[in-house]
Amino acid sequence: MTRIKICGLKRPEDVEYVNQYLPDYVGFVFAESKRKVTDAQAEELSGKLDKKIISVGVFVNEPAEHVIKLVKKGIIRMVQLHGDEDAEYILKLRENLEETAKIIKAVRVQCREQILEAEKLPCDYLLLDTWQKGAY
């Protein structure tokens, strides 16, 4: 089944658009980016989201405590990791979050072996991404 995620919401009008079209997921970027949001911005925007839409926090090497706080406050309902987060980091999230908070791990791959290794991670979904030196 195809699922749709629109990422990088930052403005109130972005929420108006997604509420009209109802994608499955929307992403709030907490990593360094021109689309980065603060906790307060994400809280305000997620509060206006249609409840059918699952909010996803996108992170790169973020302290686990910050991710956990955002989920527990209900600002995000799903976690997408794009950095160097390993199995230990993911397990720490799992220990502190409800089962309903799914975890996506993005893995930058260059070869088949990296995909096979990534399959061992304790995440709910793998997102295979293009490998580019120094980029997440």
Predicted regions and their residues:
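Conserved N-terminal beta1-alpha1 strand-loop-helix module at the mouth
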Residues: 1-136
